[in-house]
Amino acid sequence: MDDIDVYGQVFYSLKFGEAVEQGLLTDYKVVVLAVDAKQVDRDMQKYFKNTDGALDLDDVAKMIGCYKALIKEGLHVNDHQPMKRAVSFCQSIASSKEFSKEFGKVVDAYLSTYPETSNVTCQLDHVDGTMNATEKGKKLSWLKENTEDTCRILSNARCLSEGVDVPSLDAVMFIHGRKSKVDIVQSVGRVMRKAPNKSLGYIIIPVVIPEGKSSEEELKKNPSYQIVWDVLNALRSHDERLNSDINKVELVDNIKDKIEAIQKHIEIVALVDKLPEHSTEATKKSGMGTGGNSSKERGDNDEVRAPKAKQDELELNFDTVQHAMLAKIVEKCGTRTYWEDWSNDITEIANKH
């Protein structure tokens, strides 16, 4: 609708940031989960042994990433209550059915390895365009219901992109890529509805770092990361604040400052583990590699913590993933002439006054 000859001049526009400030929309946060395939492969052997091979390692890793985001593990947010309602977007009806069928099994297997992680149960269902309006309505009503210590997830391919009235929806999860910017914006719009006690809507994007591959190498050539750039670019085209935040990253050198520049709307959570196999027990007890919060020092009891050198290795790997992701976000989603244009605009305004 940018064609003035067809649609005429814009009479009035309300920017996204202004709508949030006026309380018309809920603000959002994009959570990118970078999951280490090596860690998942090691931790999920019980699941792989007992399954029929329906899911591959990437699928399982994404599910674990989604679960950690839903319980807000490792997120820098004021409200630490786990999410209660989410919609997942898959690439097909078949993959959506598989996601809803296997997600709970994957989470159960993961929690059997890390029982201290959370007590939140996930319930899933699937909906698709072949279902009639009554059946779809029942599934949406199920999603709206209030539950205790339970997160309900309704999985679909495309039928929930628009026309979904669930204001209390906490998150949308992009399990697979989406080519259409319109589809992305409509899907994201599901979590921006206002609801009581709702401070943020979350956009969860799990990505996998294959075993033996560096994060920089994967970001350059792995097409599975395209969904990150697509979602951010779609949001950037509608939210002037995100556009500014992404371009601020380019101005600072320190990784901490880069993270703070975008953390209000984008958070990168790296679930990585580079400890050797013989250090697994130490890792589990220290909470490292799992997103855990334990920081127990070795004392009179038998509690063990991984050696400092190994902790430094984990921290370095975590920073490497974040730094690589931030650099690629600026490259893929930033505006190369942003600050030049900004300077020109300021100069023009100053000259007018």
Where are these regions (language model features)?
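Short regulatory helix/loop adjacent to the ATP-binding pocket of P-loop NTPases
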Residues: M1-V6
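Short glycine-/polar-rich loops that comprise or flank the Walker A/P-loop
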Residues: Y7-Q9, L25-K29, V120-Q123, P167-A171, ...
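Conserved interdomain linker/interface between the two RecA-like ATPase lobes of SF2 helicase motors
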Residues: G8-A94
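Intrinsically disordered, low-complexity acidic/polar segments
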Residues: Q39-R42, K97, G212-S214, L242
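"Short basic amphipathic alpha-helical interaction patches in structured regions
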Residues: K46-F48, K101-G104, S187-V188
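Conserved C-terminal RecA-like helicase domain
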Residues: A54-N156, R178
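Long, largely alpha-helical accessory region at the distal end of helicase-like NTP-driven motors
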Residues: D58-N78, S214-N351
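Conserved RecA-like P-loop NTPase helicase motor core
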Residues: V127-K248
